[in-house]
A protein has these predicted regions:
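Short cysteine-rich clusters marking metal-coordination/redox-active sites
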Residues: 3-6, 21-24, 34, 41-44
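Short, hydrophobic/aliphatic alpha-helical segments
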Residues: 19-26, 65-76, 108-126
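Conserved phosphate/anionic-ligand binding catalytic regions in large, soluble enzymes, centered on
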Residues: 85, 125-144
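Residues immediately within or flanking Cys/His clusters that coordinate Zn2+
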Residues: 1, 18, 31, 38, ...
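A structural-propensity feature for long, helix-poor, extended segments
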Residues: 145-146, 150-196
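Short functional micro-motifs and their immediate structural scaffolds
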Residues: 8-12, 29, 39, 49
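Flexible, glycine/charged-enriched surface loops at secondary-structure junctions
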Residues: 11-13, 17, 31, 106-108, ...
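Polybasic, low-complexity association/targeting segments
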Residues: 59-91, 177
């Protein structure tokens, strides 16, 4: 990711530095700095990274949503700072879905809305509220692409809840402790199947084994179907 001021690369430092954010000018303590020593506050970093998410999604030609998610996971800045499936899962689904359409969506607008809603999902919602962020992100994705709102009549309104509910049920049956990647795999697979059934759009999917085991010290190991 490039500094908007000087175009040099932004990196993550091991230590925090005090200074003024080069974007908004407020005093901040940050571990994000560019090659010319410009600092970035948390709020501006998140805005820049959301733009990075959109850039990766725009450039992706994949019709497999998990492949898009891996592209996001593997970006240095996103991985170390902004790994929130609440936002990334829906963005990856929208990208793969759009790549399957002959008449494309306004992907930037769709991603903006998915990320806006995804940011409202509280952290640790899986254990504190029975709502996995990845599962809810799938519901957000489906709601946005079908333009469903609280007063939408008929089955369309219910489809969003049915999808989210099926993701949660399938994930819950595996048991804890939580794993964000497992939540993404279960929920995205359910969503791929549901979109084909309800909307007639066939995204790509292949069975996978997890190669992010090292990210989760509480990995279930052989108790996880993706181990």
């Amino acid at each position: 990711m490039k500094c908007p001021k000087c175009e040099s690369s932004i990196r993550k430092e091991d230590q925090m530095t005090n200074g003024k954010c080069i974007v908004c000018g407020k005093d901040c303590e940050s571990d994000r700095i560019c090659g010319n020593l410009h600092l970035f506050c948390d709020d501006c970093t998140e805005r820049l990274i959301r733009e990075r998410v959109k850039e990766i999604c725009r450039d992706s030609a994949s019709k497999d949503p998990y492949s898009v998610l891996e592209e996001l996971y593997e970006d240095d800045i996103i991985r170390t700072r902004f790994l929130k499936n609440h936002i990334l899962v829906g963005s990856a689904l929208a990208t793969a879905y759009n790549n399957c359409l002959s008449e494309k969506m306004d992907l930037d607008s769709v991603l903006d809305e998915i990320m806006r809603r995804g940011a409202l999902i509280p952290p640790k919602a899986c254990g504190h509220a029975g709502n996995c962020g990845s599962s809810v992100a799938c519901g957000i994705f489906y709601s946005v692409i079908t333009d469903t709102h609280p007063l939408t009549p008929g089955e369309q309104w219910g489809d969003v809840s049915v999808l989210t509910g099926s993701c949660l049920v399938d994930l819950g049956r595996i048991g804890g402790p939580r794993c964000c990647n497992r939540g993404a795999l279960v929920s995205m697979k359910d969503t791929v199947d549901y979109v084909e059934e309800r909307l007639g759009v066939k995204m790509e999917w292949k069975d996978r084994k997890c190669h992010y085991k090292g990210w989760n010290k509480n990995c279930k190991g052989e108790g996880c179907p993706f181990y």
